[in-house]
Amino acid sequence: MGRTREFDEEAVLKGAMHIFRKHGYQGASIRDLEEATGLKGGSIYHAFGDKAGLFDAAFGHYNRTVLEGRIERFAPPGSGLQGLRELFLSLLHEPDNGSLGCLITNMAVEFGGGADPHPRVEAALGLLRTTFRLRLTEASIFARDADGTKANRTAIRLLAFYQGLLVLIRGGEDKAGLQQAIEDEFNQLETMS
């Protein structure tokens, strides 16, 4: 019978998530992770197997709490284009001013270029693309898109725009300009409806 965990798993995953967002996977040292989680290296390895196991758990926590939470809050089923607009605008109001960036975006860049994308990155981008497509089909013009081609193409374009916004926010781009770009994009989509 295994030992029960004697730590607050949510707090540990949140701390690790912060370090991976700040330093990336390669740049996150065990010492950084120890400080952020309050666990010693041996406890990290015992609980998660290795650094990759902790990363996977922290990334899963990020996808559940940050990504899915943001979608549920701003673009739930039935919210259509307005929900997507709100989802995009919400990116401009991060508590850390976007300085840590998005874990999904950061890891897509760090792990990119390999033969196989990281499964957590692939799943997160897939969730965004699917959410965009589903909210688009709630708009009248996309509802008439019998085979879904137009909604799929637009969802991919919005995914590229969303990820680009996250990079620009992390790079310190003027948020007023980014807000106007978001408004312009969704105003154009609404005129198509």
What are these regions (language model features)?
Residues 83, 96-119, 167:
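Amphipathic alpha-helical segments used for helix-helix packing
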Residues 12-20, 91, 132, 162:
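Short hydrophobic clusters on alpha-helical segments that form packing/core surfaces
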Residues 67, 82, 115-141, 153-156, ...:
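Amphipathic alpha-helical packing segments from all-alpha helical-bundle domains
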Residues 11, 19-53, 57:
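Helix-turn-helix
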Residues 1-7, 140-147, 193:
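N-terminal intrinsically disordered/low-complexity leader segments
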Residues 60-66:
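Short, basic, alpha-helical segments at the C-terminal edge of helix-turn-helix-like DNA-binding modules
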Residues 57, 70-100, 151-158:
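Hydrophobic alpha-helical connector segments
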Residues 94, 158-176, 188-193:
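Amphipathic C-terminal alpha-helical segment
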